[in-house]
Structure formats: structure tokens, C-alpha cells
């Protein structure tokens, strides 16, 4: 099962920069983007654990240069039930949300 990497920023421009850095830094797939409200935005990537860690590290650095980084997290083995509640693309759904 693939890991799930997430980055949350305040502001869309920082999230776009972070997302670009993530997919360029490691072999990950961008599986979702969510605008939460209050300026908060989250991007989610899937890949192996090392790739998600490298991607989120690069994305976090990029987001901090452009705007405000709020949170970064990697879940090594997300449970399959998460897909029923959260838009994390566990079954190959790569649409941006």
C-alpha cells in the first residue's frame, strides 16, 4: 500500500508552489487538493514512504519560501477505510478535489 503525504498552507499560491516542488522532488502522484476555508489549502500525494517523505520535505521548504506553511504529515500505511470519508485517492482516484 502506498503512503499518503499531506501539506497544508495558508494561501493557494504557497500550495501550488509546494505541490510543484513535491511532484518534482520524488516519484509521487498528486491525488488531491482541497481548499478548506479561511485561506487554508491542503495537497495530498501518494507514493512509497521514502518518496512521500522526500516530497513533503521539498514541498514544505517551497511553501515556507512563498507563504505560510501550516502543517506537514506522512501516513506510511493509511487504512483503506479512510477513503470512504476523506478524498485521499486510495483506489487510484487521482482527481483533484
UniProtKB/Swiss-Prot annotation:
Q: Which is one GO molecular function term here?
A: structural molecule activity
Report the residue ranges that make up the BMC domain in this protein: 3-87
Chain segments annotated as transmembrane = none
Pathway the protein acts in: Amine and polyamine degradation; ethanolamine degradation
**Could you give one GO CC term from the UniProt record?**
ethanolamine degradation polyhedral organelle
One GO BP annotation is: protein hexamerization
Record bears the keyword S-adenosyl-L-methionine: no
Alphabetical list of InterPro entries matching this protein? Bact_microcomp_CS, BMC_dom, BMC_shell, CcmK-like_sf, CcmK/CsoS1_BMC
Query: Is the keyword Cell membrane in the record?
Result: no
Q: How does it assemble?
A: Homohexamer with a central pore of up to 8.6 Angstroms diameter. The hexamers pack into a two-dimensional array. Interacts with EutQ.
UniProt lists the family membership as follows: Belongs to the bacterial microcompartments protein family.
* NCBIfam families from the UniProt entry: PRK15474.1
Summarizing the function annotation, the protein's role is: Probably a major component of the bacterial microcompartment (BMC) shell dedicated to ethanolamine degradation. Each homohexamer has a central pore with an opening of up to 8.6 Angstroms. A positively-charged funnel leads to the pore from each side of the hexamer; a phosphate or sulfate ion is found in the pore. The pore probably allows metabolite passage into and out of the BMC.
What is the recorded name of this protein? Answer: Bacterial microcompartment shell protein EutM
- Source organism per entry reads Escherichia coli (strain K12)
Amino acid at each position: 500500500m502506498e503512503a499518503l503525504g499531506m501539506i497544508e498552507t495558508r494561501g493557494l499560491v504557497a500550495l501550488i508552489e509546494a505541490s510543484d516542488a513535491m511532484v518534482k522532488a520524488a516519484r509521487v502522484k498528486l491525488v488531491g487538493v482541497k481548499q478548506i476555508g479561511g485561506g487554508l489549502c491542503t495537497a495530498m500525494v501518494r507514493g512509497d514512504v521514502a518518496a512521500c517523505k522526500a516530497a513533503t520535505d521539498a514541498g514544505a521548504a517551497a511553501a515556507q519560501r512563498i507563504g505560510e506553511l501550516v502543517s506537514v504529515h506522512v501516513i506510511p500505511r493509511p487504512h483503506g477505510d479512510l477513503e470512504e470519508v476523506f478524498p485521499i485517492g486510495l483506489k487510484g482516484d487521482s482527481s483533484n478535489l
